[in-house]
């Protein structure tokens, strides 16, 4: 049975459906400047697909923790040790629980490091637990930066490696990547290039428009 998500309407008033089965078999990139509706679109996608598929959201700003109230997502405090994050990620895959990894309030280096550890543990789960999971990463340019920033090389390596695994090899392990960014030019090319579907919103900067054209 096919399940379609109603993503909105066209200028003619026709519904715009998104096939969940197709989404789980591919990778999606959502791009648009601040205020273009990315968070609204992601929220719509998550709320409408929640009854049908397990979800894991990497949430740097705390925008998605309220999914717990209506849909029962487990909210995970991102300020944990490496061993704790790995253990939780393993249980999430084993028990097929939808979750939100809340990184709000952590500095950027700790956000990158802990998100990377969590995603890598999801990726490294035993084969018997490779059930389909919709993995949504908001502000993806933070976790897969195109250039080195002010964070340690260790944090950048862990985070970028996890994002690369998700987008390049995750599908075979049941992980369907959905990444959202407001600065496409700041997102690592090898991560963005793996997306097979694109939803493009309002974009102002020439450098981002040039990347989108690529």
For each of these PLM feature ranges, what is it?
Residues 1-17:
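N-terminal pre-Walker A segment at the start of P-loop NTPase domains
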């Amino acid at each position: 049975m096919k399940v379609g998500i109603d993503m909105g309407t066209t200028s003619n008033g026709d519904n715009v459906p998104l096939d969940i089965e197709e989404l789980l078999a591919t990778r999606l990139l959502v791009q648009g400047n601040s205020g273009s509706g990315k968070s609204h679109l992601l929220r719509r996608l998550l709320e409408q697909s929640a009854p049908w598929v397990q979800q894991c959201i990497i949430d740097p700003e705390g925008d998605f923790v309220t999914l717990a109230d209506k849909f029962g997502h487990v909210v995970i405090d991102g300020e944990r040790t490496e061993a704790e994050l790995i253990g939780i990620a393993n249980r999430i895959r084993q028990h097929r629980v939808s979750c939100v990894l809340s990184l709000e309030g952590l500095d950027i280096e700790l956000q990158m490091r802990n998100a990377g550890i969590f995603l890598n543990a999801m990726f490294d789960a035993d084969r018997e637990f490779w059930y389909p999971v919709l993995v949504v990463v908001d502000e993806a340019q933070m976790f897969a930066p195109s250039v080195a920033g002010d964070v340690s090389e260790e944090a950048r390596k862990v985070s970028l490696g996890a994002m690369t695994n998700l987008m390049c090899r995750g599908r075979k392990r049941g992980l369907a990547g959905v990444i959202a960014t407001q600065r496409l030019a700041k997102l690592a090319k090898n991560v963005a290039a793996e997306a097979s579907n694109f939803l493009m919103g309002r974009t102002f900067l020439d450098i981002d428009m040039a990347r989108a054209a690529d």
